[in-house]
Amino acid sequence: MAKKIRLAYTAAALIPLSVLAAACGSSSPSPSSSGSSSPAAAAMVGSALPTSPSKTAETITETGSSLLYPLMGTWTSAYQKQFINSAGAPLVTIETGSTGSGTGITDASTGTINIGASDAYLSSSDMQTYPSMENIALAISAQQINYNLPTVKTPLKLDGTVLTEIYTGKITKWNDSAIAALNPGVSLPDLTIVPLHRADSSGDTFLFTSYLNAQDSSGWSSSNVGTSISWPNVSGALAETGNGGMVTGCAATKGCIAYIGISYLSKTQAAGLGQAVLKNGAGQYEAPTSATISAEANALTGKTPANETLSMIDANASGGYPIVNYEYAIVSKKQMNGIAAEDIRAFLYWCVHTGQSGTNYLDAVDFQPLPSSVVTLSDNQIAKIGA
């Protein structure tokens, strides 16, 4: 029988879910934020990173981000098939779930699960509350803005100010003059806009509200940026759970607008939803493609600190798509025992090395791989996971 890995502690209080966009520091010891390491340090990290699981039939529990969930499912399936015992059974079982980033953060921080998957990193205050927790970058993803306008065939240009006014109820019709000004020559319907947002605590909400605040700080306050927020009271607005719910809800509601993770691109296309081109920090309008996501990430990944808490929202990157992020594993450095720690280290190491293959894993969910400098930072953090 598989043994379930548990953390070495439980916390009485739930983690605050006001995850902020600014890069934050950890109270835990960490290597230099430059991402470089000495040969001796690299050797120490390498010796702490097993490349295969133990043989004690452990079970690792993971839940959280619905944006990361499709990739995590592919990763865990491949990992369990690669590492098997003489009877053909997996050496380690990995249980995954799509509950939203906020739940993943909370459950990992309070010891309910081993790995919390999140599109958002822990805020500095959360890191002070839970100093043993780490934000480990696993891949680079992005977020779409989708809409249900069957008569509009040209991708609509939108910016943070217009989106803010839609989600605060100031713009209520698709043929509003502010939208028309961004889209000259496009025939916009006299149709009521139905803003759709997440009902669950979500990293996608963190990303979306971060973009609104970055482009229109007077219209969308930084105090209303997070995984779980107080949405303005907008007539007709709807809420759905998970990215899957957002796709289904938007597809069923003519006039809807929604923010949906890039890993659901094939589903939004199959549902016939339009995809906006968004204004970036350089004043350009870009769609989320491999090239534009990479352009945004490349402008910032070199600034990733040792604890990997970095916002890539609305950078001043030419050709960059403005809603890009790291996908994180939120993990405690203090596991129940050495075997548990070894198995978690081995799986996460596999994710940031073998799991970075575009052909085998990332391309199917429209994610981008970590640059080698960030892989080194993730390795450094993974190596800290112990008992």
List the model feature ranges, each with a label:
Residues 18-23:
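C-terminal motif of bacterial Sec signal peptides marking the signal peptidase cleavage site
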Residues 1-12:
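Bacterial N-terminal signal peptides that target proteins for export
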